Design a protein with these regions (language model features):
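Polar-ligand-bearing catalytic/cofactor-coordination segments
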Residues: 79, 88, 114-123, 182-259, ...
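Membrane-embedded alpha-helical segments that form the functional core of polytopic membrane enzymes
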Residues: 47-67, 161-176
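Alpha-helical adaptor scaffolds
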Residues: 253, 257, 278-322, 326-327, ...
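Small-residue-rich helix-interface/hinge motifs
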Residues: 57-120
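Hydrophobic transmembrane alpha-helical segments that form the core helix bundle
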Residues: 120-218
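Alpha-helical repeat scaffolds
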Residues: 225-235, 261-274, 299-316, 339-353, ...
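Topogenic membrane-insertion module of multi-pass membrane proteins
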Residues: 2-58
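Alpha-helical linker/edge segments of TPR/alpha-solenoid repeat scaffolds
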Residues: 291-305, 332-342, 370-393
């Protein structure tokens, strides 16, 4: 009963955040429309031109603000001793490998961009975290001021004036969505991360661990080969926030990379508890691993179908190019459905994704798990053939 109530509370909080985010964007849209009507801009440019301006402006300024937001994280990080690892806008990622920048494709549900850095060494029980996390919102603030200034400097040109006003208002919306502590989509926003880190040094440590894991991944070091102390589970209280719960998720990924399926299942079951702040995208990841473990173990159809909830299927559509998802779907087709042709299609898709994936060490681990699936399928076929021959004799 308690767990059910906690789960409902998490879902309600997420829905409230979604509605609040939508209301912020709607409010900015209304403000822009009212401003253009009151200042006669709509009369000057016409309704159709205004709609075109809105469409072009929203798309253009959304990308501009996302780029500037991530650039703000980069500048904030560099000013406080962080080192560049990767910079992503949409699914395009620039990542440092062996001292050189290379372009790869990577996407994460709930994020329009991401700037990941290697943090300073852990000293005196802390690291600087405020400027790196707040840098994005601060950069959006500076951009808003610049766009409003441009709007008033170009006040005689109606459509340009309206265009830059739109850029400023959209920037305010993004500042509020990223700065007010809440979970946006499937991830915590910058404000929420800052709030949790200001409350607990243990959360700062969890933040540091996540960045270090990512930095080591970029150096092609597999998670199974990283220091064990990074994966010690935080307290139950600490894991009520997403930053600390992510360490538990990473511990599960490490167990999978070590091929320790019993430990991985134990950790996944634990991190899926409703009282933990495990983010929706991480809950999807954990459930995917549980499906894989079930396929490699007892392979019970009813258990597999129970994992594939409506929420899981929603994420599955978004994460269709994720290597772990493709590996698990491959196992489902081969071991669950006994359909090698369908499995081969998924394996071909995996190879396409692997060719442009930024973390080669993760692909190496996925290939090892795929090989385990193939070995199990081969063994089960041999058992069937052996039983058939025995029966015929």
């Amino acid at each position: 009963m308690c767990q059910s109530m906690e789960s409902k509370r998490h879902k309600t909080r997420g829905k409230v955040a979604e509605i609040f985010t939508l209301l912020i964007y709607l409010a900015m849209g209304v403000c822009h429309g009212v401003y253009c009507i009151r200042h006669g801009i709509l009369d000057q440019i016409g309704l159709l031109s205004y709609y075109v301006l809105l469409l072009v402006g929203i798309v253009a300024f959304l990308y501009i603000h996302i780029i500037l937001h991530e650039l703000g994280h980069l500048i904030g990080g560099r000013l406080t001793g962080y080192r560049f690892v990767s910079f992503r806008i949409g699914s395009f990622m620039w990542i440092r490998r062996n001292g050189k920048l290379s372009l790869a494709k990577y996407s994460l549900a709930g994020t329009g961009g991401q700037c990941l850095m290697d943090p300073p060494e852990w000293k005196e029980d802390t690291i600087p975290f405020l400027l790196y996390n707040a840098g994005g919102v601060l950069m959006n603030l500076l951009a808003c001021l610049a766009f409003f200034a441009a709007a008033f400097l170009l006040g005689q040109i109606a459509w340009l004036h309206a265009f830059f006003i739109l850029g400023g208002l959209l920037g305010i919306a993004l500042m509020l969505v990223n700065g007010i502590p809440m979970q946006v989509g499937s991830a915590d926003n910058d404000g929420n991360n800052i709030k949790h880190m200001r409350q607990s040094i243990q959360t700062v440590r969890c933040f540091w661990v996540q960045l270090r894991i990512n930095a080591e991944n970029a150096k092609n070091i597999r998670i199974k080969d990283m220091p064990e102390e990074w994966f010690l589970l935080p307290s139950d209280e600490a894991m009520q926030n997403g930053l600390c719960a992510a360490v538990g998720v990473a511990a599960c990924s490490r167990a999978m990379d070590q091929m320790d399926f019993a430990l991985a299942k134990k950790l996944a079951d634990k991190m899926l508890r409703p009282e933990y702040g495990t983010l929706p995208v991480h809950r999807y990841q954990l459930t995917t691993e549980l499906i894989f473990i079930e396929l490699m173990g007892q392979n019970r159809r009813d258990v597999l179908q129970a994992y594939a909830t409506r929420e899981y299927q929603k994420f599955d559509k978004v994460m269709k190019s994720n290597p772990s998802r493709l590996r698990t779907q491959y196992a489902w087709k081969l071991l669950g459905d006994k359909n090698p042709k369908a499995a081969q299609i998924l394996l071909d898709e995996f190879e396409k994704v692997a060719a442009r994936y930024p973390y080669a060490c993760e692909i190496e681990g996925e290939r090892q798990l795929i090989a385990a699936v193939q070995a199990q399928y081969q063994a089960s076929n041999e058992q069937v053939e052996s039983a058939s021959e025995g029966s015929f004799s």
